[in-house]
């Protein structure tokens, strides 16, 4: 009898053990990303996500999102954050900072409570959308509600949504303060306060708002700051508002190791011709092209479209709903090229971008660092090409010195091994719905990476929008004159652009 009971107990234990081993096999995990990675994300201590003893439901979301092992910043941050200690973390762009604070934040949420338990602040609307999506993706099995709120959208909609339980609030400082001041967003029992891109959030324009927001939180809150750069103002905030923070610095060098940087000296009027040459010679999966002004963004996007390449553009003057659509469609691979201002330099994670082009060279090292960090994400390879004119030569030298990096002259032929992958269709993309994902994957598989001219041709009508959606309509006469001056710099004849419409495919 005793032997029978022992055998039965043993079989039960074996069954439970087998069930424990099999749970991961039952997950709907994406195909493994086979691209090589640099030491920016592979130089780890060898920890696994299971070593953090987090909820099974959270691990399910992590693995189903395609995560395999924690990156260095995640290894350093997650165990400390789970204890509730304040954290000041500095790591390179594209090394997994977002998941480093999202995972412990999700772990500490009590889904049975209806109170807001975490506030995540970011400096831009696009980054707010992206961060909230990471929270929803990783926490999809936890039964929690994540809400994103930013300026440029209806305040009444946010007020209505806050009538329901919101466990994690992600937003830009101004809008969150507006909701908290009106008593709509209750942060009185919100123990977690996170700032991503903290150097930007603690700039003079945001600091007063941040300090007001902190006053709505309980005194025993946990404050976590994440950024690639930490100016002196961060130290002032740390001394004033943080309690014995655990400091993490993984910045042995500032630029990502997987990004190869080149410059090309070119006269202003020859820049478009140079860009056309780059498009014809490079194997671009997706590219982001940066300009220093919104006028130049629109004009360059129009010119690229006229050259026969698919192109979107985005800048701060566009309506928020149109910016959102451009961002969403570009992330999902609808278009190969995006022209933008510095609106998208911070935190935006688009795995498929393998080329960044600075059509206009930035004025400072911080902007340069954030721009080129849009390629080479999460330890992968990327290319940064800078078009330099005579006036930029001193900035080029200054940025090299400040970042401790070398920007080389562009060679006649660029080695494809530096930025091209054998199977670009396997690069992970955000999934909005399965049917859309299948359609995008099929498009990528059936389109040659070198045949860019016929991928979403500019006048096909698919993304040809009426004037007023990010076009020239509605501007003052002075802005139109400014646009005309910029147009002449690109080599357009006088009076070519009437200012009434734009043929660049935007939304």
UniProtKB/Swiss-Prot annotation:
Keyword Mitochondrion: no
Subcellular location(s) of the protein: Cytoplasm, P-body
Top-level taxon of the source organism: Eukaryota
E.C. number: 3.6.4.13
Motif residue range(s): DEAD box: 196-199
Catalysed reaction equations from the record: ATP + H2O = ADP + phosphate + H(+)
Composition-biased stretches (Polar residues): 495-507
Domain Helicase C-terminal: 258-418
A single GO BP: negative regulation of translation
Gene Ontology cellular-component terms listed: cytoplasmic stress granule; P-body
UniProt keyword annotations, A-Z: ATP-binding, Cytoplasm, Helicase, Hydrolase, mRNA processing, mRNA transport, Nucleotide-binding, RNA-binding, Translation regulation, Transport
Annotated ATP binding sites: 91-98
Motif range (Q motif): 47-75
Residue ranges, annotated region (Disordered): 445-507
Transmembrane segments: none
Record PROSITE patterns: DEAD_ATP_HELICASE, HELICASE_ATP_BIND_1, HELICASE_CTER, Q_MOTIF
Gene Ontology MF: a single term: ATP hydrolysis activity
Helicase ATP-binding domain span: 78-248
Written domain comment of the UniProt record: The Q motif is unique to and characteristic of the DEAD box family of RNA helicases and controls ATP binding and hydrolysis.
Reported function: ATP-dependent RNA helicase involved in mRNA turnover, and more specifically in mRNA decapping. Is involved in G1/S DNA-damage checkpoint recovery, probably through the regulation of the translational status of a subset of mRNAs. May also have a role in translation and mRNA nuclear export.
PANTHER family, per the entry: DEAD-BOX ATP-DEPENDENT RNA HELICASE 50 (PTHR47960)
Family of this protein: Belongs to the DEAD box helicase family. DDX6/DHH1 subfamily.
The protein, known as: ATP-dependent RNA helicase dhh1
Record organism: Aspergillus fumigatus (strain ATCC MYA-4609 / CBS 101355 / FGSC A1100 / Af293)
Lineage of producing organism: Eukaryota, Fungi, Dikarya, Ascomycota, Pezizomycotina
């Amino acid at each position: 009898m005793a032997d029978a009971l022992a055998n039965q107990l043993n079989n039960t234990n074996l069954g439970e053990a087998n069930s424990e081993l099999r749970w991961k096999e039952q997950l709907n995990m994406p195909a493994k990303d086979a691209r090589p990675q640099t030491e920016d994300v592979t130089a780890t201590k060898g920890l696994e996500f299971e070593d953090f003893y987090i909820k099974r439901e959270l691990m399910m979301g992590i693995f189903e999102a395609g995560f395999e092992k924690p990156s260095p910043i995640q290894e350093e941050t997650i165990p400390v954050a789970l204890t509730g200690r304040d954290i000041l973390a500095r790591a390179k762009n594209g090394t997994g900072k977002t998941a480093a604070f999202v995972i412990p934040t999700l772990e500490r949420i009590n889904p049975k409570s209806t109170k807001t338990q975490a506030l995540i602040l970011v400096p831009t609307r696009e980054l707010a959308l992206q961060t909230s999506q990471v929270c929803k993706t990783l926490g999809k099995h936890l039964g929690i509600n994540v809400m994103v709120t930013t300026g440029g959208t209806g305040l009444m909609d946010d007020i209505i949504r806050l009538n329901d339980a919101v466990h994690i609030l992600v937003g830009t400082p101004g809008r969150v303060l507006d909701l908290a001041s009106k008593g709509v967003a209750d942060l009185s029992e919100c123990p977690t306060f996170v700032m991503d891109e903290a150097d930007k959030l603690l700039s003079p324009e945001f600091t007063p708002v941040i300090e007001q927001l902190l006053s709505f939180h309980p005194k025993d809150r946990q404050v976590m700051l994440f950024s690639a750069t930490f100016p002196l103002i961060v130290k002032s905030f740390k001394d004033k508002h943080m309690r014995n923070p655990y400091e993490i610095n993984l910045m042995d060098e500032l630029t990502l190791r997987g990004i190869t940087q080149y410059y090309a000296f070119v006269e202003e009027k020859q820049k478009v011709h140079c860009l056309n040459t780059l498009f014809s010679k490079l194997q671009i999966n997706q590219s982001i092209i940066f300009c220093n002004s919104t006028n130049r963004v629109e004009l360059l996007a129009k010119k690229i479209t006229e050259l026969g390449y698919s192109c979107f553009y985005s800048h701060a003057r566009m309506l928020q709903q149109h910016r959102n659509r451009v961002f969403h469609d570009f992330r999902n691979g609808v278009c190969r090229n995006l022209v933008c201002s510095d609106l998208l330099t911070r935190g935006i994670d688009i795995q498929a971008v393998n080329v960044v082009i600075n059509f206009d060279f930035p004025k400072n090292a911080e902007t340069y660092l954030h721009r080129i960090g849009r390629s080479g994400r999460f330890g992968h390879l990327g290319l940064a090409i800078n078009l330099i004119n005579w006036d930029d030569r001193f900035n080029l030298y200054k940025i090299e010195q400040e970042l401790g990096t070398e920007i080389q002259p562009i060679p006649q032929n660029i080695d494809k091994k530096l930025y091209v992958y054998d199977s670009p269709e396997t690069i992970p993309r955000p999934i909005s719905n399965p049917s859309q994902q299948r359609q995008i994957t099929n498009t990528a598989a059936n389109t040659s990476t070198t045949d860019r001219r016929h991928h979403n041709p500019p006048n096909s009508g698919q993304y040809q929008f009426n004037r007023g959606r990010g076009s020239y309509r509605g501007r003052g006469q002075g802005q139109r004159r400014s646009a005309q001056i910029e147009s002449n710099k690109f080599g357009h004849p006088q009076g070519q652009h009437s200012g009434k419409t734009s043929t660049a495919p935007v939304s």
